Amino acid sequence: MTLFLPGQEQRTRVASAIAALLATAFVVLAITGTARMYTPVPYWDMWSATLGFYMAVNDGASWLWWAQHNEHRIVLSRLLFWLDYEIFGGKSIFLLVMNYVIVAMAVVLFWRISRAQLAHLSDPARRNTVFFTTCFLVAWLYQWMQQENLAWAFQSQFFLAQLLPLCAFYVLHKSALNDKAQLTFVAACLLGITSAGTMANGILALPLMVAYALIAR
């Protein structure tokens, strides 16, 4: 059992507060930067890939849902683009919010992974390590270095192309730990299939999952 002396506990609390403040600062600064850069006017690829797509689909060109955007098939992002125009007035606010929501989902996924990987530690060491790791991940994923992705309403596919394959592998790993986890395995397969609708690199998720399933069988 790990023993924490009063002085150590106090230092841990101070360090935790600092880590939480820094992580919060990164998020607040990112949101502030996004708000300052916001414009409802479509930018660059958005003219054809969001506004043009929405108008064409409404005119009956349903095949565009699966059409390539360069080498990618951005089916899931097109669903978000369609919702933005159909429900939220095409002002891109919904799309920007979704960028942050998807990143938050990635943080939650990494939090779950870190908890599982650190399960061998005893409390409070495990709890503190997971907390500091999560704060670091929040700051890392919301850093303004990737402002072009966070502040541009067209970029949800870049986040989804990382999140969904990672989710698929995580769920597949969970199913491998339990011989009776058929539903979990099906969910992993569905996530792998869905990954193909993010970007071109998402196509690799299913073949790699098959390889992992054979190894972990």
Task: Describe the role of every protein-language-model region.
Residues M1-A30:
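Start-transfer (signal-anchor) and selected internal transmembrane alpha helices
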Residues T2-P6, L204-R217:
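Perimembrane helix-loop-helix junctions
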Residues L29-A49, M145-N149:
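Helix-to-loop transition at the C-terminal end of transmembrane segments
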Residues M37-P42, M55-E86, K91-V101:
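Membrane-proximal lumenal/periplasmic loop motifs of glycosylation machinery
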Residues V97-P124, C167-V171:
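Transmembrane-helix motifs of polytopic, lipid-linked glycan transferases
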Residues S114-Q143, Q162-L163:
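Transmembrane-helix signature of polytopic, membrane-embedded enzymes
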Residues L160-T184:
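Membrane-interface transmembrane helices that cradle and orient dolichyl/undecaprenyl
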Residues L183-T198, A205-V210:
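Membrane-interface alpha helices of multi-pass inner-membrane proteins
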